Amino acid sequence: MRIDKNLPNYLTIARIMVIPVIILLFYINNSLARKLGALLFVLASITDFFDGYIARKYNLVTSFGKMFDPIADKLLVGCVTIMLLKKDNVDEIPCLLILAREFLVSGLREFLALVKVSVPVSRLAKLKTFLQMFALSILILGSKGSGIIYLDIVGEIILWIAAFLTIITGYSYFKACKTYF
């Protein structure tokens, strides 16, 4: 099967480009818009898996992809998290823990790249990302968009679990930098 050599990069760019649409749909504030926003967020989240998978499987890894894939992830999660904090009654603590960790780890990754140290992504970190995106999907939809009364509570619980894993998985980056402090 022939794959366009830029497909993983297109998926990464698409993930960034869909962020304003998700936010716009969220602020329209009706059930259909919430459902469409949640669906777009889920699809954008899925591209996070496929861009890396396709790049590795078909040897299409690029410098652009290495740099912008994590940026696209942080933008997607960060913008949606801030949107939910501003508009809905989402607990600030797990959101702030997630955002702080993402900024710190991004800086640590940049530093580690400069000193030629690689920290592989663990299964726990992949689970953390999945739970973050799953929780945010549920919270975008919320009880307002779904009609399911306790959906917000389920989303908050999953967000707290993701925040806990966020702290645990962030430690591996600090540990890798320890010799440079």
Curated annotation (Swiss-Prot):
GO terms for cellular component: plasma membrane. It is a multi-pass membrane protein. It comes from the Bacteria. It is found in: Cell membrane. It is an enzyme of class 2 (transferase). One of its GO terms (molecular function) is CDP-diacylglycerol-glycerol-3-phosphate 3-phosphatidyltransferase activity. One of its GO terms (biological process) is phosphatidylglycerol biosynthetic process. The chain crosses the membrane at residues 8-28, 35-55, 64-84, 148-168. The keyword Transmembrane helix applies. Gene3D superfamilies: 1.20.120.1760. Its EC number is 2.7.8.5. InterPro entries: CDP-alcohol_PTase-I, CDP-OH_P_trans, CDP-OH_PTrfase_TM_dom, CDP_ALCOHOL_P_TRANSF_CS, Phosphatidylglycerol_P_synth. Belongs to the CDP-alcohol phosphatidyltransferase class-I family. This protein catalyzes the committed step to the synthesis of the acidic phospholipids. This is CDP-diacylglycerol--glycerol-3-phosphate 3-phosphatidyltransferase. It comes from Rickettsia prowazekii (strain Madrid E).
